[in-house]
Amino acid sequence: MTTIVGSNLPVARPSWDHSRLESRIVHLGCGAFHRAHQALYTHHLLESTDSDWGICEVNLMPGNDRVLIENLKKQQLLYTVAEKGAESTELKIIGSMKEALHPEIDGCEGILNAMARPQTAIVSLTVTEKGYCADAASGQLDLNNPLIKHDLENPTAPKSAIGYIVEALRLRREKGLKAFTVMSCDNVRENGHVAKVAVLGLAQARDPQLAAWIEENVTFPCTMVDRIVPAATPETIQEIADQLGVYDPCAIACEPFRQWVIEDNFVNGRPDWDKVGAQFVADVVPFEMMKLRMLNGSHSFLAYLGYLGGYETIADTVTNPAYRKAAFALMMQEQAPTLSMPEGTDLNAYATLLIERFSNPSLRHRTWQIAMDGSQKLPQRLLDPVRLHLQNGGSWRHLALGVAGWMRYTQGVDEQGNAIDVVDPMLAEFQKINAQYQGADRVKALLGLSGIFADDLPQNADFVGAVTAAYQQLCERGARECVAAL
């Protein structure tokens, strides 16, 4: 079968000598996001410098995870990234991978050996939030998690990413080798701390002396990652094949924008990713708050009020000038003042860029999808900024309409009387409230959900008054008119 290796392509393959690469990074979780983000940054560094930092890719799960590793091997570890802008698409053939491993092919031992090699300086992860096996309530490692139980009983044949890291560090300690940096690249707040808690939790349960050695010798930098990478579908893969002239089963599409902010805290060296657009900083948290409030907060605002206004995607929503203007005003007038950013951060440029990203029609980001799980997203994205304004006397009418938009959305019926498929862990509570209350009484009942609003906001007369008024306006006039009136 013809692959991207042997074909004439309309795009250049990597021109550097692949043999110069060393597997100095072992990456756990070779999913779409990693291939469009960290592996791409590393590729651009290889392209523009004489760096030798290559990646040994590891997938741990059966099924599609194994198929991807097999497909990568069939095409010499090359794959295609399609960066889809509003006007055009740029194709890139990425060549930063040196090896690709899977336990069903290489055994646990093959993966642990790679992690325990002297040249391995970083073990990075994109394993999603559940890959850290944390207890939701305490944030500590869940020792009853089936994968963790298995890894405690079979420490030399682990199944979880955390189990592999702890066993590999034990092997390095035994061999007298320097530790590696554990770098989480998951879209989780303070991800380095989350990784550290999990690794130390398992090490402590295995051997307190090992845990003490890890605490002393391993660093867990936090990172903030940003790029919209929709899950690869047969349609997107075929679309890329049509442009490329050959089928690449590992191909992925993404937006042109990418951002990577990394806490500069490495124990055993690191690539100069800052030469290709990443930022090394002392503290990632301000950048996480910037993303959470300005990007995610305005995304939620557009999702609820856009869906109610009859728009299917975020890009459709911001074709309406009133929505576009309101999202920008929310970011600059109400979210930006709540942030404490390092000197030189241009929040106006960031907000302008976000509006441009939201407007990209080739990324069909559905309002319904972003509206999911609002009970978990609302507190961080919209309610915490409101609290700061209530303390400091700032204006927050866009935030009030955003909260009211969520309340109106959870009624489960749109402005035309059609059912809304509300997806939320608290759906049963919403349905109970919907059956008993309407109007201002419904607002009061929703404010009684302390898991969302805590105890302070329902006691604040200004908050209750503003949200109730915004909700009643939405019910009477509809979302489009309310957004236009802001």
Where are these regions (language model features)?
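Substrate/ligand-engaging "lid" and interaction regions
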Residues: M1-L486
